[in-house]
Amino acid sequence: MSVYTLPELPYDYSALAPVISPEIIELHHDKHHAAYVKGANDTLEQLAEARDKETWGSINGLEKNLAFHLSGHILHSIYWHNMTGDGGGEPLDKDGVGELADAIAESFGSFAGFRAQLTKAAATTQGSGWGVLAYEPLSGRLIVEQIYDHQGNVGQGSTPILVFDAWEHAFYLQYKNQKVDFIDAMWAVVNWQDVARRYEAAKSRTNTLLLAP
């Protein structure tokens, strides 16, 4: 029985054009994201088999595989909803996302400073990775994380609310080796309503985290 399932896209393949082509969206969701879902489910089965047989020789690889595939599934599930064909601009109070706008200004000094930091974090990933805006519960502030692969270089307890996929499969068919151009273009499809909802949800869960005895 599968624990994880591939979510449906919240729009059709052409919804984000011309920023992201229909071909990329279809391949990215139906093949790449699906592979992470399958990988997570397969690894859970392999871990269950290892427990049943008490054979732990491959535990290091299995735990690493689970982190890789599960994190890939989670980040992509956020990624699809973080984008919309009528998005872009910046979060503004008049659009009902004023609290997010205030949090960005408090955490980064200005929206321009935040945009520059997240753009640079995503565009300068070495190899495969992500640029992520995350809520950090200890300080109650927003931070930018530069994630290696899907799971490395992450602050424990942080919650991703806006993710930029910097893996080549996210852009190469359209942007070739111009990762910076892709990241710059991504700002035109950011769904600030979705990011704001994730910010509010992340804040509301802070009190349930046992951060200290």
UniProtKB/Swiss-Prot annotation:
Which enzyme type, at the first EC level? oxidoreductase
Q: Which Gene3D superfamilies match?
A: Fe,Mn superoxide dismutase (SOD) domain, Iron/manganese superoxide dismutase, C-terminal domain
Q: Which cysteines are joined by disulfide bonds?
A: none
MF-aspect GO terms? metal ion binding; superoxide dismutase activity
**GO CC, one annotated term:** cytoplasm
Q: Which UniProt keywords apply?
A: Cytoplasm, Iron, Metal-binding, Oxidoreductase, Zinc
Broad class of where this protein is predominantly found: cytoplasm
Give EC number(s), comma-separated.
Answer: 1.15.1.1
The cofactor named in the record is: Fe(3+); Zn(2+)
The entry's localization annotation reads: Cytoplasm
Q: Where does Fe(3+) bind?
A: 28, 76, 165, 169
Question: PANTHER family from the entry?
Answer: SUPEROXIDE DISMUTASE 2, SUPEROXIDE DISMUTASE [MN], MITOCHONDRIAL
Family per UniProt?
A: Belongs to the iron/manganese superoxide dismutase family.
Known role: Destroys superoxide anion radicals which are normally produced within the cells and which are toxic to biological systems.
Q: What is this protein called?
A: Superoxide dismutase [Fe-Zn] 1
